[in-house]
Amino acid sequence: MEVDLLHFEKKYHNCIVAGIDEAGRGPLAGPVVASAVIVDNANIITGIKDSKKLSKKKRELLYEQITSNYVWATAIISHTEIDDINILEATKKACSIAVANLSLEPEIVLVDGNMQFKDERFVSIINGDNLSLSIAAASIVAKVTRDRLMLDLSAEFPQYLWHKNSGYGTKEHIEAINIYGLSPYHRRSFRCC
């Protein structure tokens, strides 16, 4: 049975609805990125789904379509701020900033996961990136944005293979940390090795 990815957007059909998702909560290095997207229900882009279920090539293609056709915004919280305030608070801050950066103010904000926000517009949906088109679109924008940032950082620190692992704790990444130590972009609050 196919899921209606517009179910939640239809539920709030009289409201401006944004979806929000993040990329980079679990990596050992780099920022956390949150993106907010307001889908135009009159212009549905086909193929949008959770970024983790798409090839890199398909994500890149959809990123270009989403950012060309929908209202969107992104926020980036650095690895140092993650260390200062913790990953959960950094993620929530990125989500709030991304919504504030939208050129159109949403009345409802659909959030992937179970994070709770003081802002009453925020509605948490567990597994939201599989249940909401807006959240799925945001997951693509966040993932592509973060992957591009990590690719840029990989040029400066190629030994950590961030161009392949995006800062996640792969075997090769942990081996590189054991050999070279932590880079300036590693999260000090994350214990890995």
Curated annotation (Swiss-Prot):
Recite the UniProt cofactor note for this protein: Manganese or magnesium. Binds 1 divalent metal ion per monomer in the absence of substrate. May bind a second metal ion after substrate binding.
**EC numbers on record:** 3.1.26.4
PROSITE patterns found in the cross-reference section: RNASE_H_2 (PS51975)
Main localization is cytoplasm
Asked whether the keyword Nuclease is assigned, the reply is yes
The reaction(s) this protein catalyses: Endonucleolytic cleavage to 5'-phosphomonoester
Gene Ontology biological-process entries:
DNA replication, removal of RNA primer; mismatch repair
Domain annotation RNase H type-2: ranges: 15-193
Q: Which cofactor does it need?
A: Mn(2+); Mg(2+)
Q: Where in the cell is it found?
A: Cytoplasm
Class of this enzyme = hydrolase
Q: Which GO terms describe its cellular component?
A: cytoplasm; ribonuclease H2 complex
* Annotated keywords: Cytoplasm, Endonuclease, Hydrolase, Manganese, Metal-binding, Nuclease
NCBIfam families noted in UniProt: PRK00015.1-1 (NF000594), PRK00015.1-3 (NF000595)
Q: Which family does it belong to?
A: Belongs to the RNase HII family.
Please report the name of this protein according to its UniProt entry: Ribonuclease HII
Q: Which organism is it from?
A: Rickettsia africae (strain ESF-5)
Which lineage is the organism of this entry classified under, starting from the top rank? Bacteria, Pseudomonadati, Pseudomonadota, Alphaproteobacteria, Rickettsiales
